[in-house]
Structure formats: C-alpha cells, structure tokens
Amino acid sequence: MKEFVSMRLLPEDMFWSCRQSTLAEMKKKFAQVESAAEEPRVLCIIQDTTNSKTVNERVTLNVPASTPLKKLFEDVASKVGYVNGTFDLVWGNGDNVTDMTPIDQNSDKTILDAGFEPGKKNFLHLTDKDGEQPHIMQEESGTTEDSAQDRFIGPLPREGSVGCTNDYVSQSYSYSSVLSKSETGYVGLVNQAMTCYLNSLLQTLFMTPEFRNALYKWEFEESEEDPVTSIPYQLQRLFVLLQTSKKRAIETTDVTRSFGWDSSEAWQQHDVQELCRVMFDALEQKWKQTEQADLINQLYQGKLKDYVRCLECGYEGWRIDTYLDIPLVIRPYGSNQAFASVEEALHAFIQPEILDGPNQYFCERCKKKCDARKGLRFLHFPYLLTLQLKRFDFDYTTMHRIKLNDRMTFPEELDMSIFIDVEDEKSPQTESCTDSGAENEGSCHSDQMSNDFSNDDGVDEGICLESNSAAERIAKVGSEKNSLLYELFSVMVHSGSAAGGHYYACIKSFSDDQWYSFNDQHVSKITQEDIKKTYGGSSGSRGYYSSAFASSTNAYMLIYRLKDPARNAKFLESHEYPDHIKQLVQKERELEEQEKRQREIERNTCKIKLFCMHPTKQIMMENKLEVHKDRTLKEAVGIAYKLMDLEEAVPLDCCRLVKYDEFHDYLERSYEGEEDTPMGLLLGGVKSTYMFDLLLETRRPDQIFQCYKPGEVMVKVHVVDLKTESVAPPISVRAYLNQTVSEFKQLISKATHLPAETMRVVLERCYNDLRLLTVSSKTLKAEGFFRSNKVFIESSESLDRHVAYTDSHLWKLLDRHANTIRLYVSLPEQSPGSQFRRSIYQKPSGDLGNLDEACERVKGPAGNMKSVEAILEESTEKLKSLSLQQQQQEGDNGDSSKSTEASDFENIESPSNEIDSSASVENRELENQIQISDPENLQSEERSDSDVNNDRSTSSVDSDILSSSHSSDTLCNVDNAPIPLANGLDSHSITSSRRSKANQGKKETWDTAEEDSGTDSEYDESGKSRGETQYMYFKSEPYTADEGSGEGQKWLMVHVDKRITLSAFKQQLEPFVGVPSSHFKVFRVYASNQEFESVRLNETLSSFSDDNKITIRLGRALKKGEYRVKVYQLLVNEPEPCKFLLDAVFAKGMTVRQSKEELLPQLREQCGLDLTIDRFRLRKKTWKNPGTVFLDYHIYEEDINISSNWEVFLEILDGVEKMKSMSQLAVLSRRWRPSEMKLDSFQEVVLESSSVEELKEKLSELSGIPLENIEFAKGRGTFPCDISVLEIHQDLDWNPKVSTLNVWPLYICDDGAVIFYRDKTEELMELTDEQRNELMKKESSRLQKTGHRVTYSPRKEKALKIYLDGAPNKDLTQD
C-alpha cells in the first residue's frame, strides 16, 4: 500500500517512463522464455554405476540443446548429490555409442555439438573418476540427512531380492544415506553370503581402541606359522585395510579362511554372541606365550560369586566364576511381561531365589536339608562390559523357537556400582564353608577366595580387587563404586525371526563421538534417535507372539566401555605404528594399487564371442576374445590366431576378423583398410554384451579374401539334380535386397555355370515353406529374403518344368529333403551264448514280411535253428552278393539312370515296396564296403539301464558341430575365382541346416513309454506288419565313431525321412542288425548319455532331430500285455546290496511261479546262477528298498501291479520259504553290540502279526537275549539303513512306546523294514580318544564308500567352530 501511495506521488511523466521500462523488461523476459520453449531439448538418462544399490536406477535430465557440457556436469552433480569434478560421464549402451572415453567436463562445447541427439534418449553412465568413488556433497541442513538416516538404520535388503524397499528414488535423488568412505572415513565389509554376524563383530573390534592397538603391537613371525592360517595376522591385515583402503567395502574371505572355513560355511547362519566366545577362545590359543596372552581376560573378563546361604545357621557355600558376557533375560519364564530396561534385567540377574520344599539345600553345618537362599553376586566388572539380550526363546506350546521383540531400553551411560554388594565383602569370612550347593566343586573357604584374587596380582582388569586384606578390599570397592560408570559404544542389532535374520552394528566412534551404522558394505552416520529405535517393541498393543507388524529389528548385544580417563585409550596414529604394521600398510597399498590398475585394464577390455572354422579339422570352434580397446585390428587378429591355436594349421597372414552373426550364420561385413583402427572404435566401445560376434576367417595361400559389405544378404544355394535325385552342398552367394529375381538368377548362373533361362529358384523361408520364385520383376526383399537365406535351384531341360509345382518331381524331392534327418546308429555286438540264440529268424531276401517262411529257411536238416553266427554271416554274404548284382547291372546297362540311381535295398522286398531309391553311386559303393555282421567280432551287450547310463562309451555330440563338418562350401565371387568360405563355415550335407537352428531352442521330445502300462505290438491282430508307410526314404553309410566308442563297434550314418514309422525304420535296419525287427530294440540316446527305449511302433521319427544317436540292442520286442522287467539280486549282507542281473519279460495274467520258471534258464545262462524254483523268491523293489514278498500264486496285474520298465528283486533263500500268506510280515533284523561297538549281519524275522510283543519274542529266540532286556529301533533312510556305530546308540529312537508296528512312529506295514535291536543290560564300550578317532576314520570311510549315509532328520544347526590349524580335520571325514 505504501508503494502504491508513493507511486501516485511521482510526477506523471516519470510515472509513465517507469511503466514503459517495466513493460519492456517484461517483454524481454517473455521473449527469452518463448525462445527457450522453441529450442529443442535433450533427454539425458544417467545410470550411476559406482554403487551396487543405485546401478539399477536412472536419473533423468531434460535440458536445452544449447547447454554447455560444463553446465550439464553441474546439473548432474546437483541432481545426484555428488561433488562436481569427482565423477566421470561416459556414453551408455545406446545406439550412439562410439567410445568409452569420458566426456570432457570442462568443455564449453554444447551438448548438441558433443553428439547428444534431441528428441531421443541419450544414455550416460556415471563412473568413478581415476578409480576413486565420487565425493558426496555435505548437507547444510540436518533434515535431509536425518530422514535418510532413518531409512538406512534398518537392515539393507539383499541385492536383487524381490520386493525389497528401494532407497534409491529417481524423483528425489539423495545420496546422504549411502555415504562413501571419503565422507564417513570408514570402510564396510562384504557379506560373503550369511556372514553379517561376523561383519558386525569385526567392525566392533576394529572400533575398540584397546583391542586394535594391542593387535597392532603383536608381530607375526612368518617362519613359525603359515600366514594363511594365522587368525591374528589376518585380523591385522583386515584392520589395516579398514583403515587405509579407498574401497567402499573389503572382503573377509582371508579371515574366514584362517578360521579353517570353506565356502559352505559362508552359508551357515550363526549367533554373534556364539562367534564372540569362539573367536576369543581361538585368539587366546594363538596368543599363548606372547605379550597378548591375557589380553581377552584383561579387557572382557569379569568375576561373579555363585553362592548358597543356609537360612537357619547362615552358613554359606560359594564358588567364583568368570564371565565374558552377561546374559540378560528379556521376559521371565512363565511371564507375559518383559523387563522394561537393562537395569531391571540386571537386578533380576542377581536376585536370589529361595530353595524350599523339595528343593531344600543340604547344609553341611546343620547336617540336614534346610531352606536356603541361592544367588549371584558381581565381584568384578571388566573394562569392556558385554551384555547379551536373550531375545531367542523356546515356546513349549508350539514346540518352536521364537524371537522376543519386546521393548527393552538401555542407557547411553550405565552405572554398575549399584550391582557390587559391599555388604557381602563386610560379612565375616572366618567360618569354613564348603560349596555343597555347587556341582563339581570342592571346599571353597574365604582364604581360597582371597587366593583367587591374589593370583591376578599385577593384571590391570579395570576394577581390581587384588588386596589380600578384606578391609583393604572393602575400602577399594567402596572407593571405586562411584567410578563404575560405563559408556555405550556398540549395539549389535538383529533383524528377523528365530528362523533367521540379519545382523548389523551401530557403533560410536571414540574419535568424534559420532554414531555410525555398519551394515555390511554400507557405512552411514546415524543419531541417538536411531539407537532408540533398536529398543524393540511397537507403539500399539501386542500379544505374546512376535507379530509381522511389530518391529523385528532390535538390539541383541550391547558393549560398554568403562569411563576412566587414565585408562581410556585412543587409536594409534600412523606415525605411532610399529615397524611391522608400517610395512604391512605399505604392502597392502601396493596390492590395492595393483588391483586398481587391473580393474582399469578390465574396464577398457572388449570381450566378444569369437568363432572360427578350423581349416583342417573342419569344426566350428568358439571362444571369448578379450582385447584392449586401444589394440588395433591387426593386433587383435594375432591374439585371436593364438587363441584358436592355428599356428600349425594356417599362416597368420591368411587370417582376418570379420563381423559375424552366429544365430543367422551371416557374415555382416569385413574390415578392409581398417587394420590400424582401434578395436574399441571398431566394436562401438567397451560393452558388457555385443549384438554381434566376430569370426576368424581363414583362406588358402593361393586365395584372396572376398569383401563383405554392409547391406548384403547371404544366400546359400543348393543345386538340385533331378536325375540323381541329389541335393548338392551349398555354395554361398551374396546379393542385395533390391535386386530382382531375374538379376538374382543371373548372379547364380555366374556362380554355378547353369543357364538362367531354364532355372527354377525355390526359396525356403521357414520349415516346410518352399516357395517357387515365378515373378522375375519382384525384388528379393518383396519375396521375403532376409540376412541369411537358403534357395534350391534346378536348371535342367526336363518336362518337369511344365508340371504344376506342387505335383512336380522337384517339389517332391525338396519335400523329402526337408524332412530328411541324419541319425547315427550304433549296432549291437553279438556273441555265442546269447539268449537270442533261440527264436531268432533271419529274413530272406525274397520276402522279409513272411516270418513263417523265414523260420523254415533257416532251419537245418534236423529241424534245429541256425546259430546267431551263421545267421549274421549269411546276412553279410547276402549283402555282398546284392552289391555284386548291382555292379553287374551297372555294367550291363551303361548309362541307364535306373541302375545308377538304385538303392542298396532295391532288390530287398519290403511290406510296402515303397523304398525311395535315392542313393548315388558313391554312397552305394560306401555301403557295399561295410561289414556289419563279422562273426569274429560279435559281442553280447545285455546290460541294465544303470549299466548303460553309467558306463557309456560314446557321447552325444552337439548337432551344430556335426552338421557343419561334412564338406567345404564354395563362395562365389563374380570378379574373382571361387574360394571356400571360411573353410567350411557354411558346410552342409543332405541334412537341412535350418532344422538344426530351429531345434536349438526346442527341448528334445522324450519317449513316454515309461508312463504306459504296455507297448504297441509290432504286428496287428491279423499278423500284418505295422511298418507300412509311404515315407520310406532310407540311406545308410558306414561311419567311424569318436575315440572311446569301443573297438569293433559298428556304426551307421543313416539319412531317413522322419515321417517314417518306428516299425518301418526297424525293418530297414534288419539287414544290418542281422535279426528280425521283432528281436531288437531301439534306444534313443540323449545329451546326458541316458538311453530310453522307443517302443511306440506306430509313431514316426518326427521327435528325432539331426545327429541324434540311436543304440540298437538285441532283445525280443514286446507284445501286447507284455512288460520289460529289470531283475536285481538282493544281497542284504553285501556292501552293495543291489546287483543287476538281467532284463526279463513278464506278461499280464502270468503267475509269479511261471515268471520264476522262465527266469531259471536265463539265470543259468546269463548269470551263472544254477537255482531251483524253490530256492529263490521275487519281491517288490522301490528304489533300493526291498518290499513286499511275492508269493508263487500271485498273478501279475491282478494281485501285483506292473508297469513299463518295472524293477523287481530276486532274493536267494538259505532254506525253505517261510512266507506263505500275505498276513505275515517279514522284517530284516540286525543286532547292535554296544560293548563291542559292532553290528551283526542281517537276519530275516517272519512275524504272524504286527505285534511288538511277537517281534521281541522272535528276536529273543534268535539272539538268546532275555525278552525283558530286548530293545529295538527302526532303521532310518534307504536300505540297508547304514549308520555309524558311534551314533547308533544315541541317535536312534530306541524302544518306542507302542504295542503294534503299524502305528506312529514306526509305521511298519510292509515287508522289508530294517529293525536294529540290542540288550539293554549291555554297557557301551568306553573309548579312548585315539580309539574314537580311529573308529571315526573307519566308519567315515565305510559309509562314504557304500554311499548309504543319508540325512534323515531335520537339519540340525551346525556348531560354529574355528579350527586353529587352519582347516577341519579331514581325516575325520575321509579315509
């Protein structure tokens, strides 16, 4: 109002002048705003890679395009809270990446001139500058810091965990809670997995001046001890690194290794108080006979008196105990009310209890039981007072451990003088008193107590009571009561439940009296208010159990230091370090600098996939090329040359690197004239992943490399010959997408020298999509060409050109080619004595379908069948005669296409007579050379699936490798002579490479015969073969398998139409196997070398893919209602109780006795077991456990369920079969002799009922132990329920309180259960330590060899141990 009045008092001309100038200034500002609004803006997306918590977050800036780079850095620094100049910005993974060089932060160049693009996302990475973490801006106000600290005081979520709270928010970007070492001055510790409890304790010890200084004074003697196993030395190193390292966090693996822990220990959760005690014990052992021998006692040990006083005569028995920490109860037993404070819990700790009633105390003076007072009195408090808040309890209602999250306050300063009882010191001690109230203690008089203290003369323990005079001691205590003031400096916090959680530490620095949160690798400043949040509890009402909504983050251990200016130490300054610590500091700094240099090299190293087709081996090799970004392309070729080990294969100048797309098998471009270009520029910078690969291309010395230009497409051209019905291996032609089909034909014509006028071009776009290119003016792009393409061309003068494409011979040939797969077939080895000597009939060449005639033809004069050897030899001779006949036909017919195109099997009639005749002359000649049925090399191969799987001599080979190893492709260059492309890079066979690629991402289809109750019969009900099909293309060649497949092993490489049925496929293999298809089995071999039988004869081979392996095994094919059964022998008293015998066939409706009769000759012939039918039994097999005993009259599928690949136990009997009825129960008993520490052999006990009384009676009869002394326990785990003799006496549940065996906890309802029994009057053998260790070695070795040791009980908590020799005793676990 005053301004308005004063303006009205101005002269009129001056008023208008002021108004005009104001309007002009406003117009100028509006113009600037309007111009800024019209100026293009640049969107910058910055990712902070300096911190693990922020690496997944983004900060966005939208700035004008005219912004200088210098201003951009200032804006980024302001946004993220870093000091400008302490970080770098480099290009991220966007399309504009050309270099990883940091952007110049002092440049006045605009961001537009620097390469930033308006209207697009510009990705930037914020990185360390010169290997150092960015510096954090100092907060002017405590508000932001406090709020950040509120977030940070709690346990940080695991990196990568789902659902964790994100402290790093893009909108309100603040780093105050994640302070780097440069701000706090402290370094964090990396959590190995679950070592947060260790990190909390180590940081507390590091922040304790007295402990750190004493540790530094200790000097390690390398000549006396291994530094790796020295705990004090590794702690020294860790503390030095915590003081001097520039890293945000350092590893603790060297410390845990000195504990003797392996990597699995990092995954064990332990208690921080447990670790504290164990570590102090270990340090005391290591520091024996050194200056620090009594350090732990001096700093942490206190003393208290455990007493019992008779209330009638005043007589008192007592003993002196030492302690390292005081355990304080959170909530008294049976109470729902927790103690409110630590002081209240301390009072309860020393509160005496009255022993009365049945708990009366026997007084030595009164010579009778009297009421007494029992309690504890503190005699001495340590310099460093440790209080454990017992937050973990056991709930006897739910029988589970629980955590008590009740609120319990603790003061920053704790006065302990009120807990020293001076009256106790004044009480007369003239009377002798024995500690009959304390266990394992002798008499304890007052002079003995004095002697306890006098033994500590000269030891400075804070509050010393070393005077022998009671009066002096009382005076000392009285004078020091006022000096027992302790200062809190460490709070170890637990967040979580009794099942698990997270530890971190809140520690006050004695250097600046500031509180810090040490949460694994994160260190931050906190306040006193944050400490109060660890009291526990919640503001609302809370029931007995911990609630998910109540705070589960609360203090667990408190450490106080006595306030005594005379004794309170400060941390040693660097100039005060002992010489050995100075040397250690220098050594660690050098190591850190070396690591920094190595990280810098890694950060500037390009890592990319490298491929190379080996010029001689013709296999595609793969490796990772690591090259510094400043290395030139020429240098990178040399590195790749050595990496691929080509020194002896090809000269270096015959190699080059080209850009390659491995997925599409496409050469994108070559790098002519760029030999001196740095790899970083060539590859588009250093990236974690690249969207392309590199290929090390090779050539012969007389060839020249072709130039590959970007934008070209690669076309693999297969020439089709309709006369020979063959498809040639591909040649590679590079074309352009804007070329027409007519121009493309001309290009192919130059490459193949075939006329373009009659050329038919078929493009294979995808599986079963064969498109004839008929429109000459269409471009390749319009026809659907892509980076890598496959075409088939045919250019003959045949009339097939005028037939409709889908009816043409060309289409049929290509359709067959597209469905042809290559399989590797392992033929069986055969030997005399095989079970197939009987009932095997060789099919004659005239009619393979008539089995009756075949049977008659192979019979001798006496009607006996020929041996397998004769049959196979005849098969071989027949193949040879067929080959000779074909050769004669070729000679007679001359150029007749019929004879040259005939298949080896043309003259072998099949049920369908539709075998595709497509073998070339060369293939036929190869086939004629194979000798499948050499009788001198025949071996039997009757093994179980377990043997097959575990003892496999051949391995599955990757389909890509096999499919690329046939013949070299030819690369056509219209200007230069044709040369092989990358020495066979694109090599193919008759097999389509497209299918190999398509099948890579598809899992193999497994046969599901295991799920069926039976299998398809090879013949239908009328006896007609099921193998008839129109898809009968089948061509075979001999094949030499990899080394290790076995000498004499015969292999076939078969090209077959995958639409053929399994039945027809087996019939095609008959001449090579030498037996009818009904007498051999087909097993498919998977990548893990596991074999599964293919039994569905009506199904096609469509589930098979290129280069699958097939194993043929002799054995009769199953008929309807038949099942293949694996028979194992049960050997209860052998180290390996389960032994495979043979494969048998059981049929539906067959009785157990009938199956036993069929097994007898097979057992005699194949296994050498000459048994009578009543000398063995069959029983159920479940994994390795014996089960129900099958009785002779049981019928399969009626009384006994049976399935494919069923397994059964055969058990040889020692006497007459005792099992006669299903109401009986057969158990396996084993006696335990504790006095001898040994187990007897198994003995079977047959019970008439499930009565425990009957079991004990039978065991008593068997062993001679009186019935009343029999104790038994059920075995645990799988048969034979092995258990160490050191554990069996205590670990088993002996003599369960049940009357029948079929109830909890036994549940013995079936045969085969294992029962251990013993004489309860037999004493356990007492072992010396030497005997125990020796027995432990033997037992461990025995159990490991048998492989029967199992974990049958719920996982027990593993005791925390520190091994002073650096490692656990290996002899205890292995022989």
Curated annotation (Swiss-Prot):
- Top-level class of the enzyme under EC nomenclature: hydrolase
Entry's Gene Ontology cellular component terms = cytoplasm; cytosol; nucleus
What the entry lists under InterPro entries is as follows: Papain-like_cys_pep_sf, Peptidase_C19, Peptidase_C19_UCH, Ubiquitin-like_dom, USP47_C, USP_CS, USP_dom
Q: Which PROSITE patterns match?
A: USP_1, USP_2, USP_3
Known catalytic reactions: Thiol-dependent hydrolysis of ester, thioester, amide, peptide and isopeptide bonds formed by the C-terminal Gly of ubiquitin (a 76-residue protein attached to proteins as an intracellular targeting signal)
UniProt-annotated catalytic positions: C196, H502
What ranges does the record list as Low complexity composition bias? 881-890, 953-969
SUPFAM superfamilies tied to this protein: Cysteine proteinases (SSF54001)
Q: Which CDD domains match?
A: peptidase_C19C, Ubl_ubiquitin_like
Q: Where is this region: Disordered?
A: 425-451, 831-852, 879-970, 982-1025
The EC designation for this entry is 3.4.19.12
Report the main location listed first in the record: cytoplasm
Biased composition annotated in UniProt, kind: Acidic residues: 1007-1020
Q: Where is the composition biased (Polar residues)?
A: 429-451, 909-921, 928-938
Recorded GO terms, molecular function?
cysteine-type deubiquitinase activity
Going by the UniProt record, its keywords in alphabetical order are: Cytoplasm, DNA damage, DNA repair, Hydrolase, Protease, Thiol protease, Ubl conjugation pathway
Question: Which cysteines in this chain are paired by disulphide bridges?
Answer: none
- Tell where it localizes: Cytoplasm
Pfam families in the record: Ubiquitin_2, UCH, USP47_C
Write out the function statement from the record.
Ubiquitin-specific protease that specifically deubiquitinates monoubiquitinated DNA polymerase beta (POLB), stabilizing POLB thereby playing a role in base-excision repair (BER).
- Name of this protein: Ubiquitin carboxyl-terminal hydrolase 47
